[in-house]
């Protein structure tokens, strides 16, 4: 008799965005002629950079000819993209990586969810709260999170990110084995300074903590004093794995490409105390479970690092950040408190009074016909907030703000 992984049964029946879809579908049934504007799920709307499109066309043509055909590629990624990543994303910031420390993948979601494969099931977990749901759910699946009680997992240490602490959590007074950090932050849209990030690196060095650092939105940072990589902090290579994505940087949500940096000097321990390089373990995991990102996709990603590609990516980011400014100004004009939207494409909106996240979501849906994401879906500290994204079309963002202003003013 085959037995199931019963940890999966601990997961709530529905993923956050499935619950939202159900409520939206119920609304559409009762209001079939109403035009909804969706500012909830963070999917992009701008086309791919032209340089990427041309590079992928060329790659397809290469696959059509025997002389230039490519079959299986290296599980770690092609050298041409790894070199482009190191030269453009890290070297200019004084961070020097070896090619063997960068692993090309099909996206940050896959890697943040799969990294637990190389870590023991009984490691203690610390997460900023609110948080991207994948971090929690992937740990539930492997038995690391414990039992869900009153919206919290029993074996997870929650580090509240509140307006009172500028959405940067306090250093815990206990030791944590694995710590998830995401900056610029999803869902709050806030950032962390070098001084604050240095505190976390020092904590990790002192406590032998592994930091899993999600920097998927670093390209949206506008403030020159905000770090783009945790490796800008001295000592971080000894304690941190960094995840990045081309999804929001270059519109690759439907193409799928990202990468993970695992420094060779980063180690973790066996029960007997032997130190094992995590780079070696991740490489072994990828060689077994991943057959590499497609050649076509990697050529498209490489193209964003050309001079013209950089211009086109910058234009895409500026478009979304202009949306964020328009939205933030409009929302604040109604008296709402709004966080984020300055160095990230997310706005974290406080519901008026003591209104709950789901109530605020439903009011916005039924009164303004705008779809957001209830903050409590990202964790207990998200209660009373809603997340809006700036990834929509300009006209939709402007119309959504008109509707919300009309509703609230």
Curated annotation (Swiss-Prot):
Record pathway: Amino-acid biosynthesis; L-lysine biosynthesis via DAP pathway; LL-2,6-diaminopimelate from (S)-tetrahydrodipicolinate (aminotransferase route): step 1/1
Catalytic activity of the protein: (2S,6S)-2,6-diaminopimelate + 2-oxoglutarate = (S)-2,3,4,5-tetrahydrodipicolinate + L-glutamate + H2O + H(+)
Residues reported in the UniProt entry to bind pyridoxal 5'-phosphate: 72, 108-109, 132, 186, 217, 245-247, 256, 291
InterPro entries in the record: Aminotransferase_I/II_large, DapL/ALD1, PyrdxlP-dep_Trfase, PyrdxlP-dep_Trfase_major, PyrdxlP-dep_Trfase_small
Enzyme class: transferase
Entry cofactors: pyridoxal 5'-phosphate
Modified residues (N6-(pyridoxal phosphate)lysine): 248
Annotated residues for binding of substrate: 15, 42, 109, 132, 186, 291, 387
GO biological process: lysine biosynthetic process via diaminopimelate, diaminopimelate-aminotransferase pathway
CDD domains according to UniProt: AAT_like
Cytoplasm listed as a keyword: no
Enzyme Commission (EC) number: 2.6.1.83
Function: Involved in the synthesis of meso-diaminopimelate (m-DAP or DL-DAP), required for both lysine and peptidoglycan biosynthesis. Catalyzes the direct conversion of tetrahydrodipicolinate to LL-diaminopimelate.
Family: Belongs to the class-I pyridoxal-phosphate-dependent aminotransferase family. LL-diaminopimelate aminotransferase subfamily.
Quaternary structure annotation from Swiss-Prot or TrEMBL: Homodimer.
Protein name per UniProt: LL-diaminopimelate aminotransferase
């Amino acid at each position: 008799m085959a037995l199931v992984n019963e940890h999966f049964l601990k997961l709530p029946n529905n993923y956050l965005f499935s619950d939202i879809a159900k409520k939206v579908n119920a609304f559409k049934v009762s209001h079939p002629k109403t035009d909804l504007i969706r500012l909830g799920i963070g999917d992009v709307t701008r086309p791919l950079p032209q340089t990427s499109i041309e590079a992928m066309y060329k790659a397809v043509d290469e696959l059509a000819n025997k002389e230039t055909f490519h079959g299986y590629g290296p599980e770690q990624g092609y050298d041409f993209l790894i070199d482009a990543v190191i030269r453009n994303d890290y070297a200019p910031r004084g961070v020097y990586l070896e090619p063997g420390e960068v692993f090309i993948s099909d996206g940050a979601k896959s890697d943040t969810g799969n990294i637990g494969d190389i870590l023991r099931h009984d490691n203690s977990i610390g997460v900023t709260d609110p948080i991207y749901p994948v971090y929690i759910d992937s740990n539930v699946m492997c038995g690391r999170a414990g039992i869900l009680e009153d919206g919290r997992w029993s074996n997870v240490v929650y580090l509240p990110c509140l307006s009172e602490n500028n959405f940067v959590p306090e250093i815990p007074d206990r030791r944590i084995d694995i710590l998830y950090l995401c900056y610029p932050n999803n869902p709050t849209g806030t950032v962390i300074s070098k001084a604050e990030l240095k505190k976390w690196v020092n904590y990790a060095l002192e406590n032998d903590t592994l930091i899993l650092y999600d920097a998927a939105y670093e390209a949206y940072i506008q403030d020159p004093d905000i770090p783009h990589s945790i490796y800008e902090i001295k000592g971080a290579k000894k304690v941190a794995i960094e995840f990045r994505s081309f999804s929001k940087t270059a519109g690759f949500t439907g193409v799928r490409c990202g990468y993970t940096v695992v420094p060779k000097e980063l180690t973790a321990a066996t029960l007997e105390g032997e130190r094992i390089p995590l780079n070696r373990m991740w490489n072994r995991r990828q060689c077994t479970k991943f057959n590499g990102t497609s050649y076509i996709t990697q050529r498209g990603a490489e193209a964003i690092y050309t001079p013209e590609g950089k211009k086109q990516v910058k234009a895409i980011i500026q478009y979304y950040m202009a949306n964020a400014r328009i939205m933030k100004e409009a929302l604040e004009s109604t008296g709402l408190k709004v966080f984020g939207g300055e160095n990230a494409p997310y706005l974290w909106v406080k519901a008026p009074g003591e209104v709950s996240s789901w109530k605020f979501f439903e009011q916005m849906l039924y009164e303004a016909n705008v779809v957001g994401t209830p903050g409590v879906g990202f964790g207990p500290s998200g209660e009373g907030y809603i997340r809006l994204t700036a990834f929509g079309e300009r006209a939709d963002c402007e119309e959504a703000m008109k509707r919300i202003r009309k509703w609230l003013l």
